[in-house]
Amino acid sequence: MKNSFGMVSKDKMAEAARPFLERVGLDVDPNEFVGRLSIGQQQMVEIAKSFSLNAKILILDEPTSSLSEKEVDVLFDTVRDLKKQGMGIIFITHKMAEVFQLCDAVTIMRDGEFMGERQSAECSESELISLMVGRDLGNYYVRTYNKPGDIMMEVKNINAGKRAIDCSFQVRSGEILGFYGLVGAGRSELMKAIMGLDPMDSGEIYLNGEKTKKHDPAYMQKHGIALVPESRKTEGLLLNNTIKFNTTLAVLDRFIKNLVVNTRKEDEITEDGIEKLHIKTPSSLVNCSTLSGGNQQKVLLAKWLATDPKILILGEPTRGIDVGAKAEIYTIINNLAKQGLAIILISSEMPEVMNMSDRMMIMREGHIMGELSHDEYDQERILKYAMGVSNNE
């Protein structure tokens, strides 16, 4: 695709790219930077790229983990069209609904081993889950409801650009407060503003009844708040470093004095996390990149639990992990609440928030649209709040 001077021609490249983009229904300028596109659009660019390679088989690895519902619908329509055109699709997912919605046949794997193959029209969700985890999980949401204690954090009228607009809420010890919303609702952005990771335009934060004097991550961590980010691979862990390195990264001051490392204390912190969270590993010196998604998530939890938080903010804690690992994470969350931690659970999976939280805040476009207690939970009502539809309609 060179011009008459032997140089790469951007115009010719754009012209060649257009039919591939049109084939996946992507209406964007071929000269646009990929980094400026939404995650869903980036996913479509990857698929369009496969056409330019004349691919006959397309492998999609957890393609919906960061997509909005609208983007998922577009992706599924594209996959169905590709199937009609004769392309073979390998669709890797942990989400049961996607298996039955999209796939003809299902291959189940566990710990690197082939566990079985089924026709999706001839099997049930419980059968697949049993094959995936090696046992019948029943209801794998683990939640013991206790009366919440004192208010641990109160947020008043937080404003942070368009990410958070006049947001107020409180969370108590022993309580799991759920934050639900569609992708882009502002849940994670609000928590980052509270934590001091993003600038806050106005508002007040009270911890144990006292107004915070500063607004930065070090101050908030020192006063008992820990934020477990939603992306363990890009924000949470240094995957090419060891479990020990990652687990102790947030508490270096506990075992490093005058540039001298107290290796015994470092080992104690690491082994405590491995034991309490049942991290499956032959050694704390194993790189996190070699672990399963579930065990990576446990390492990330161990990292922030090592700071001894009183308030734990969990961003999408079960994203991209299998149902067995999810059940283990739910047990951990439930036990932490029983121990008195105030937990804020951010999730885009409605069943997760409904089954694990005591109360729920629903967000849309930076606004808190509604608050529901557990006995008020109703899927239709929650979705109306999330979509900005009046519950009186």
Question: Whereabouts are the PLM-identified features?
Answer:
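Glycine-rich phosphate-binding loops of nucleotide-dependent enzymes
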Residues: 1-393
